[in-house]
Amino acid sequence: MTRKFSVTKAFHKISVCFSAYLLLSNMVQAQKADTLFLSDEIFSLELRSNFSAIRADTAKDPKPYNGKLIYLSPEGDVIKFSVKVRARGDFRRNPEICSFPPLLVNFKKNEVRNTIFNNQDKLKLVTACQKEEDVVEEYVIYKMYNQVTDMSLKVRLVRVLYFDTATDKEVFERYSFFIEHEDQLAERNNAFERDSLFTPFDLNRENFMKVSVFEYLIGNKDWFISSRRNIIVFRSEDTKALYAVPHDFDFAGLINASYTKPRNVSEKYLSTRRVFKGLCYTEDEFSRTFEFYRKLKPVFESLIENQELISKTTRRENLRYLEGFYQIIEDKDLFKKEFLDVCETRRMYNLPEQ
């Protein structure tokens, strides 16, 4: 006997299979999703660990300590999971300079699944060295550079209650921010990190122009390509070109943090601290890059003006400092003095002229 083919039943089976496929795909995507850096909304959390030992640990390779991270979900549920916490960095770990060190928080992926920290492994947590406001200003600089290129580290501002398990007391509650792991940046941009020896001449030219001018704009000279100081280099899988990604902006003149000021130096120097460390581009190349930053000026101003965690006085100072950059690039004499007279050549790197 010949069985009749039912279009309705066949369509139903296809629909069920497709729905199952979508559900499975969504589950896989959810497991991969980086939810932490998808929002700028500030949320509060409590970080518990042996901060007495962490603050005292000045060893070259600091020890990780057991900890707990606790926060409330949007539904009001208490989310709690285990972490490892250790001090990181060099300069800011000095207790004579900073009252509290920057941290590295190590997550267990199986514990943070389906939380805001889904898919996180190790994250840098930037803490207040001295003034809490400095942290928020550095956060704003990261957000400014996010406007320059997607090849940049994302950040998330949080309010953290630090609890010392050694003394069973609160240390303090302060604003801090997490920095995206470089592996996630690489995945977003279809790139991979490179740790070979490079000079600025090996990098994508447009990328390095934007990096060097941005560092000048914020007044940060605490970076080098060759030694990879506060710079990560990635190679694009698509273009095979090398791209520099800057980080650690706390020495920027835009912030003007007290611990970054050298002694016995004039206030005039301290008020600018701008040193161009880019290459000797053509005037046309400079012109195109300056025009790129002119278009970003209202965006930068808005990021500063709308950050109400920074005092009005400091925001005005930040805006004046930003305006100083735009005045310089509009003045031919200052442009020559600040850029053309100090830019780096191939000879400085013992490279043959092309």
Where are these regions (language model features)?
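Bacterial Sec-dependent N-terminal signal peptides
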Residues: 1-31
